Amino acid sequence: MFYFNNLVRDVKKELSHYLLDNICKDLPKNITKFVFDMVWGILSSGSSKISNIGRRLFEDNLRVTENRLTLNLMELDLSKVKDNYFHYLSDNLLKLNPNVLIDETDVIKPAGKSFEGLTIIHDASKEGKPREKGFPVTGIVSLTDDNYVVPLITNIYSPLSTGHKSIGDETLKGLNQIVPNIKEGYFGTFSFDRGYDARLYAEYINDKKQFYVIRAKEKRIYTTRKGRMNINQIASHYKGKYSFTYKGKDGATRNAKASAVKVSHKDFKEDFWLVIETIHNENDVRVYLTNIDCSSKEGVIKALKGYRLRWRIEEFFRFIKQEYEFEKFMIRSLKGINNLFICMNVAITFLTSIIQTNKRLWEQIQEVYKPLTNREKEEMLAKKYSYHGINLYRAKNGMQIILGHAKWRPQIPGRNRKKRTE
């Protein structure tokens, strides 16, 4: 038997501490109230749609509520919210030497007409990548000590916007917000997929005294002690100096071998390492660029570990698109959409913080979720998400059930408008 009144009270208390003492600390009352309303609405509705969020605020006129939330999304400056959010992550959840994962995704709006900067992009989720109306999105996430995903940047942009230069420029804007929050004396490892192996990213990370690991394209030509060769030619000379095992995202243990060679490239200022990895029983050779010292086995494994969990950002994209209706927003301005995603990141991180720091409440959320489970559903989740992704899914649905029993949203300390006329 569940005492939902007690559970709702505990969640309200935890959420108030999370937002008022951390995310909205020392911020104006109007911003604090707005962020509180948005995060509460996202958690209790399980959606990023303004209409669903508005219904969970229990106000008299839903249309007025929707207009207020939409107007605030388009007009308020949430940069200080983002700063407080980064400080909270750095102090409470992230590793001291953080693993930062970067990738691009897209938001498809095939029936959209009035969105600011709506452009034509390739829909990567469909076979053949057909051209559709939508927006490109830059995503940057990091991991906790237990490898739970924590969103850092979800930036939607348009090539049609004034001042837009390139995808690389948008990515660097995000990195410029992340790097200063890495504590002095510690070093982040920034993991990029193929397509990011240009000088722009490697030299930026290197200049900031951080580490990078980038999946290399096969067509690149590098200079080694044996001359100029492409990736496949270099890989053919190395059969694997170091042997090791690791667990894939499906949980299976795999045997692999890896070697490392120092190379140079005409576009790069400094030499760097190529790590060549061969997976046993897979006809696949993977090559990574890195500025981590790979002269020893420890360095090679460090570089491979830095990249190994890069697929977690793809899992995060899948989670927000399917569980929070990421592609169904109805906000027209780019600023409003990005402010919506700031609030969504804050809400998702609240779930992660409960899993990581409040074991008693996390156990109660799991107990609430259990009656919903069945074998087929759990097997489906195991195909979609890893162990950590499944836990985040359970936290999201358990939290939605608990807050569904709330009769009103938490009150922000301060002036009560209803008492003004009494």
Short names for language-model regions:
Residues 1-36, 40-42, 46-66, 71-73, ...:
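A short, flexible helix-boundary coil/loop motif
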Residues 39, 66-146, 257-262:
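Active-site-proximal, Lys/Arg-enriched surface segment
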Residues 106, 302-330:
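Short amphipathic alpha-helical "interface-anchor" segments enriched in bulky aromatics
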Residues 124-185, 275-286, 291:
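Electropositive, glycine- and tryptophan-enriched low-complexity nucleic-acid-binding patches
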Residues 154-162, 213-240, 284, 288, ...:
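Helix-centered, glycine/charged polyanion-binding patches within enzymatic domains
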Residues 161-228:
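Domain-level cores of phosphate- or acyl-group-handling catalytic modules
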Residues 283-310:
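Extended, non-catalytic structural segments that build the interaction scaffolds
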Residues 335-347:
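Small-residue-rich helix-loop
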